[in-house]
Amino acid sequence: MELFDTETGALIVIELAMRPHNSAHWTIEGALTSQFEQHLRAVLDYPLGVTTMTAPVVVMANVLAGPADVRPASIDERVHHCLAAWPDVKIHLYGKQFRPGRKVGHVTASGPDLDVVRGRARSAARYLMNGGELP
């Protein structure tokens, strides 16, 4: 289920997906049982797994192909720098063809502090998108 949180605090249902959804890719590292495993368990009529979060805060940030990404190697080179700069951030690239603005992956960061975790995820995604600044 995809929800939007409005300025008034109301939640609006945007989409119901009866499959793993990109808005819950954070569960790969952020939950004891990912949405992918949970989906398989449900389809196979197995007991559902524990969905406890692996950290108090888990943030996923999308990686969009930047205007300079005319070849995948440019983002591949940035992955190496990103892994060194943010060793606790997990990077997932989807192997999609690169077009400016297209979602080509995501990063996930976790930890105890929302502002710190959000900053790491956004910084890593921004760097992967356009070679922004390293810490």
Language-model regions: role of each:
Residues A10-E15:
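Protein kinase-like catalytic core scaffold
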Residues M1, A17-D69:
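Active-site "cap" helix and flanking loop/linker of ATP-utilizing ligase/carboxylase catalytic domains
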Residues T54-A55, V63-F98:
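Glycine-rich active-site loop/lid that clamps phosphate-bearing ligands
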Residues E7-G9, A68-E77, P112-G119:
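Short, glycine- and charge-enriched coil/turn segments that flank and shape catalytic ligand pockets
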Residues M1-E7:
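A short glycine-rich, hydrophobically flanked beta-strand micro-motif that places a catalytic Asp/Glu
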Residues G9, T54, P100-R102:
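Short coil/turn motifs at beta-sheet boundaries
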